[in-house]
């Protein structure tokens, strides 16, 4: 591969690189190609002058720039064709009806020149193998015989113009060497600037914005996430779930706390005013309005009713120490806990029940 002559792209001098890679040597320079282009411009001017130098067509032609070259280094197919005539070489359009009628297998040709949007490059056979000598590549690219036809068909489909080079090419060292040996290429050569761009991307740390853009735009049409992106998305989903669970648990704890506080305050407030304002002989239903306390007291009274009937109900129940409304009024509850308040309410309810049973027994 080292013996193959390969010029790399400089500016827009692809026509020069195409010719030199085809001929396998530094045969043409920009100055020589510019001279050929100027000769073509002069020949065209002389043909236009035959119609009269005062004609509108001639004046318009003089005002237009050259179609054979420009300041960037581009050269037309006419310049390349005239340059090859010096070496007895001729260009034939590959997909022209005249060439297609010949029915020649591309493998049996010697070289091709390809053009697309003002870029020229050579595909040539050296020894017994084909090589893509595109000046945009870092080096020659090996093309197998079976792939050559597909390669040319792909270029045509992409809009390339392909020309077959007819004639005997100058002898070169690479052609002689590759007649004796065959080369193998493990890795395709990279484009010029591709390796530099990759190494620069590896050296520069990615910012958070670049990483975010990379995650939110996955995927170049494949719809697949790589491993890092999948892990990131999974961690993000788990984080959101944990936050939602924590919020729900916090809301639940606050709701339970408020419910317990409201229930205790309601039980105490419903029992305290009614027992304090009503006489001791009011009924159990009138003394407490809280449904929960009523159910609790009713269950308790049913369990104790038989025991109370067996005891002497004529005893002076008022002599027993009880907690009545006056006791609660004496202690406004500034130092009482919620449990003390609940116990006081239960004792008051029990006192009311006992008074009621005593009244019924006397009747």
Curated annotation (Swiss-Prot):
Main location group: nucleus
Gene3D superfamilies, per the entry: 3.90.70.40, S15/NS1, RNA-binding
Keyword Glycosyltransferase in annotation: no
All residue ranges annotated as the Josephin domain in the record: 1-180
GO cellular component: lysosomal membrane; nuclear matrix; nucleus
Signal peptide (from-to): none
Catalytic site positions: 14, 119, 134
Region (Disordered): 192-212, 260-363
Residue ranges of domain UIM in the record: 227-246, 247-266, 337-356
Physiological role: Deubiquitinating enzyme involved in protein homeostasis maintenance, transcription, cytoskeleton regulation, myogenesis and degradation of misfolded chaperone substrates. Binds long polyubiquitin chains and trims them, while it has weak or no activity against chains of 4 or less ubiquitins. Involved in degradation of misfolded chaperone substrates via its interaction with STUB1/CHIP: recruited to monoubiquitinated STUB1/CHIP, and restricts the length of ubiquitin chain attached to STUB1/CHIP substrates and preventing further chain extension.
Protein name, entry field: Ataxin-3
Species of origin: Gallus gallus (Chicken)
Gene giving rise to this polypeptide: ATXN3
């Amino acid at each position: 591969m080292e013996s193959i002559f390969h010029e790399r792209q400089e500016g827009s001098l692809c026509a020069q690189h195409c010719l030199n890679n085809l001929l396998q040597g530094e045969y043409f320079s920009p100055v020589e190609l510019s001279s050929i282009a100027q000769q073509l411009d002069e020949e065209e001017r002389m043909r236009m002058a035959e119609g009269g130098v005062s004609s509108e067509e001639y004046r318009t032609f003089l005002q237009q720039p050259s179609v054979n070259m420009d300041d960037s280094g581009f050269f037309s197919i006419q310049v390349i064709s005239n340059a090859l005539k010096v070496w007895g070489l001729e260009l034939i359009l590959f997909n022209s009806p005249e060439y297609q009628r010949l029915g020649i297998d591309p493998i049996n040709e010697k070289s091709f020149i390809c053009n697309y949007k003002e870029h020229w490059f050579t595909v040539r056979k050296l020894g017994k193998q084909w090589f893509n000598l595109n000046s945009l590549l870092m080096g020659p690219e090996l093309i197998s015989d079976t792939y050559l036809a597909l390669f040319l068909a792909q270029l045509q489909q992409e809009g390339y113009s392909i020309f077959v080079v007819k004639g005997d090419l100058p002898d070169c060292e690479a052609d002689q060497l590759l007649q004796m040996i065959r080369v193998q290429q493990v890795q395709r050569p990279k484009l010029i600037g591709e390796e530099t761009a990759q190494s620069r991307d590896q050296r520069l740390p990615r910012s958070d914005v670049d990483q975010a853009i990379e995650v939110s735009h996955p995927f170049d049409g494949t719809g697949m996430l790589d491993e890092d992106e999948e892990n990131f998305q999974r961690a993000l989903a788990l984080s959101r779930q944990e936050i939602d669970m924590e919020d729900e648990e916090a809301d639940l704890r606050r709701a339970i706390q408020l419910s317990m506080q409201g229930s205790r305050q309601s039980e105490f407030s419903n029992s305290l005013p009614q027992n304090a304002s009503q006489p001791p002989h009011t009924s159990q239903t009138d003394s407490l309005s809280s449904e929960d306390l009523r159910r609790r007291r009713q269950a308790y009274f049913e369990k104790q009713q038989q025991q109370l009937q067996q005891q002497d109900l004529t005893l002076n129940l008022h002599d027993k120490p009880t907690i009545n409304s006056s006791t609660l009024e004496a202690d406004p509850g500034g130092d009482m806990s919620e449990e003390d308040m609940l116990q006081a309410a239960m004792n008051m309810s029990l006192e009311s029940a006992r008074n009621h049973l005593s009244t019924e027994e006397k009747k």
